[in-house]
């Protein structure tokens, strides 16, 4: 089959999916329609906004479907009118069987980990949180159980020791787009070979990657410095690690922490975890084992700033601590 004969449906919402959609179109594939979530209120003003995928699909002039319910018969009927050979899912939502079984070639998914490791909604975050030095992307055949389908292609990617979620996210989206195009290329040649995840290395010890909520983002300083550092960078810039600065006889302040550095892995300073060590330029916090240097943070109602700017405008005292 030729590229121009292969009818594709693309399903995605988050900006992670945009490079994949762009790559398919730029490589000559015929995306007949794009399925994305309905517009919803976003940001402080709760302004109703479209997804990034919808905005890009509008630029391309592609038909856009935004069903509230993926099981609605009207949506299924409209999807059938495009007679897709293959459906592609990137950063979307769980599909009912009636949708993913529709095309004769099936439905494939792009996932931000080396499956079977980190099945779930937040694979990039969890790879950083666990201190992994390598991750990657996987394309696989969709089936009902989340992220369990047979693997088509995988490609590895190193993780920098100081790399944040936001930085790795962008690199993963770019790599994922390339791997996805190569995967679709395989379908032009016939039925691609796929491997059950049970046969892949690490299947028995695979970690899950559940969605991360705001309540999960509070920093626990009663952990080794390396773990605290990995936790903070795993959710920077969003949903963002936070902690409380306690001030005697005053209300505590919530601080968002964006970037840190481990300056002591073995404790040389004495003191309780959460104790603050500072001078004119540096803001350090003791952990259970070692010391973390805060490089970038944010106070309520203020913009993100470096530690020196914070110290210049905020008077710390020896009876304050972080928790």
Curated annotation (Swiss-Prot):
CDD domains: FMT_core_Met-tRNA-FMT_N, Met_tRNA_FMT_C. It catalyses: L-methionyl-tRNA(fMet) + (6R)-10-formyltetrahydrofolate = N-formyl-L-methionyl-tRNA(fMet) + (6S)-5,6,7,8-tetrahydrofolate + H(+). GO terms for cellular component: cytosol. One of its GO terms (molecular function) is methionyl-tRNA formyltransferase activity. (6S)-5,6,7,8-tetrahydrofolate binds at residues 113-116. It holds the Pfam family Formyl_trans_C. Keywords: Protein biosynthesis, Transferase. The keyword Repressor does not apply. Its EC number is 2.1.2.9. Attaches a formyl group to the free amino group of methionyl-tRNA(fMet). The formyl group appears to play a dual role in the initiator identity of N-formylmethionyl-tRNA by promoting its recognition by IF2 and preventing the misappropriation of this tRNA by the elongation apparatus. Belongs to the Fmt family. This is Methionyl-tRNA formyltransferase. The lineage of its organism: Bacteria, Pseudomonadati, Bacteroidota, Bacteroidia, Bacteroidales. The gene is fmt.
């Amino acid at each position: 089959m030729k590229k121009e004969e292969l009818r594709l449906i693309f399903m995605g919402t988050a900006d992670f999916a945009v490079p994949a959609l762009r790559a398919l179109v730029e490589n000559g594939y015929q995306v007949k329609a794009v399925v994305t979530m309905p517009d919803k209120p976003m940001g402080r003003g709760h302004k109703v906004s479209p997804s990034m995928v919808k905005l890009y699909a509008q630029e391309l002039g592609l038909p856009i479907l935004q069903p509230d319910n993926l099981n609605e018969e009207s949506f299924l009927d409209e999807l059938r009118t495009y007679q897709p050979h293959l459906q592609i899912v990137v950063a979307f939502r769980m599909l009912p069987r009636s949708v993913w079984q529709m095309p004769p070639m099936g439905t494939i998914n792009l996932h931000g980990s080396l499956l079977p490791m980190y099945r779930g909604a937040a694979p990039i975050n969890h790879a950083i949180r666990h201190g992994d030095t390598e991750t990657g992307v996987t394309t696989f055949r969709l089936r009902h159980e989340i992220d369990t389908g047979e693997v088509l292609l995988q490609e590895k990617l190193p993780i920098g020791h100081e790399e944040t979620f936001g930085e790795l996210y962008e690199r993963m989206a770019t790599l994922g787009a390339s791997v996805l195009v190569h995967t679709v290329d395989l379908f032009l040649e016939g039925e691609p070979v796929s491997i059950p995840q049970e046969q892949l290395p690490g299947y028995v010890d695979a970690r899950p990657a559940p969605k991360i909520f705001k309540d999960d983002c509070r920093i626990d300083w009663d952990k080794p410095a390396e773990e605290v550092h990995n936790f903070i960078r795993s959710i920077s810039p969003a949903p963002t690690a936070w902690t409380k600065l306690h001030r005697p006889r005053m209300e505590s302040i919530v601080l968002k922490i964006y970037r840190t550095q481990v300056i002591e892995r073995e404790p040389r300073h004495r003191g309780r975890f959460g104790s603050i060590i500072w001078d004119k330029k540096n803001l350090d916090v003791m952990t259970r084992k070692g010391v973390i240097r805060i490089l970038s943070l944010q106070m309520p109602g203020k913009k993100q700033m470096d530690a020196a700017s914070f110290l210049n405008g905020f008077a710390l005292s020896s009876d304050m601590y972080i928790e």
